[in-house]
Amino acid sequence: MNTDKISVNPCKSVAKTLVIADYPIGYASGFGETLFNLFTGFPREKLWSAHPGHNVPADGKQHAQSISLLSPSRPRWLPNQLSLAYYPFLKAQQFQAARQAVRILEDTVQRNSIKNILVIPVSPWILSAALTLHKLIPRLNLVLYVMDDWQGHHECHQLPYSRRRRRLLSEVIDRAHVRFAVSREMAAHYEATYGKRWQVVHNGVPKDSLTNGTNGTGAPRQVLLAGDVNEFRFDAVIAFAEAIERHNRRRGQEIEFTVMGEVAEQHRSSLSALQAVRLLSRRSHSECIESMKAADLLYLPLAFAERSARISLYSLPTKLPEYLATGKSVFFHAPRDSAVFRVAERYNLTPRLATIDSEALDTFVDAWAEGKQNGGETIARARSALLEEFDIMRLAARFQAAFV
């Protein structure tokens, strides 16, 4: 499997499109990878990506013409405990950044005769700039794509989800001609809440990419989480890591749990204190794929904490289809009502667990180490999931049809 070489027939009728978001197409994250794959085959000369200048696409992933915006942020040297005191200054910077962004975006649209704008809600000032642009040039075909539930994003990071921000999102939804959600659950919720039609698109892989990834004949040793660790998944990750640590001490085994991604500063010490855990930074997409193929178990967690409830409920992790395509065992560890757990239930993908209870995790780890929870019989089910929900050619065609 190599999603760097996906071949999608470009839509000849697509019009010039400007993407306005926090991260560029091809950025080294789930956000950037998903956009890169969904825009596969889209003519580069018809695609612009406007984003804060400090975020850049990964090597070999620059599929659009970049428009650099300001990057207002708290200074790195400022201690976390002073972040609230700095907040008024940050708001002033964001206000100025939004005003400048509108001027840059308006000039880009007019100078290049752009017809479509794709807006992805993350930072309020960027969303506000996109809305202002559409008010100035209402002829633009506004397409909205929600990757992370915006209210959930605020709650998870303990940010104020003010009435003004709720109105901002509601107005963008109302003005959009096409709306995309990242999961069935998110689409259903938004249709019920806002009374509009929502389509579903997310990351995918080529339909012929599934490999028969055998897990080897020896005792399982390598567990891999390919992704970042933040508030969206930390409580699940630490509970699972501690269960592996307890198992190693009881059984004298050396199961190794590798995290290949960025770990939030506030969580790094808790994980690095465990002997079973190996923390790596983000790696190239190709290196990540190779590590997946070499692992005995691929770990797919989402948080159980109340503050992360909406994110867990509606999100669909970028790595899900890539995990399935390796043919390796995937451990679905998420709340039972979450979109990702429901995917596992739809196709009876195992192993899966909907709790962070220590006894339940101990039981799972012990059984997995003995080869009783390897999920090896689910390759045919993984193939069904990939064909029915994660075929990138179908997803990209659905997505790009919005930009005519």
What is the predicted role of each segment?
Residues 2-70, 244-247:
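N-terminal subdomain of nucleotide-sugar transferases
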Residues 232-235, 286-291, 298-321, 330-342:
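Nucleotide-sugar-dependent
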